[in-house]
């Protein structure tokens, strides 16, 4: 991929990539097994509703009207997505925080600002990628969602991926990696490794990496995220992305 502009170079500097001498380690490629989410009372209903949605607009409306989640009743807004739906690069985070719940958009707080700098470092912005979360509703007090709450959202997330038709997925954090891929490995074991996600008969390359909120708490690990972004940039260049279809 071509070098970012001088503006992006400044943003890349703010993201603090590691010294050039560190280089990149080879990335392992594995294919995850499919693990069904936990069954809950409303899971079948969520599957039926999600399956009937034929466009992203219909899916958004279905989520906003869905009454099978206690989290939705406690949240201020349904946080659906941001960025360009036409992009073939899709990012998936974990759940909205306070700022996202208030704005109705994903990644608008401090973690979102760091994410924008991270993506700018490889020449992307929200006009050239698409972003959503596993959970469209904020758990109270930013607590971790319980397995049943996550399971209720999985049919909508899977349909979201199918309708967005990405050519490359970047998973931000452990919750996203675990529930998109059906793997129980920790994010430190998964990050930087190319995996695959099936959409119909097509296998989509997937790269888990560290969540920006984690990087705010552990800035020394930004160098690991930078290696992952370099790997993503290489894959995008090979695929001719971020071309829109």
Segments (PLM) and residue ranges:
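A polyanion-binding, active-site-adjacent surface
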Residues: 1-15, 24-245
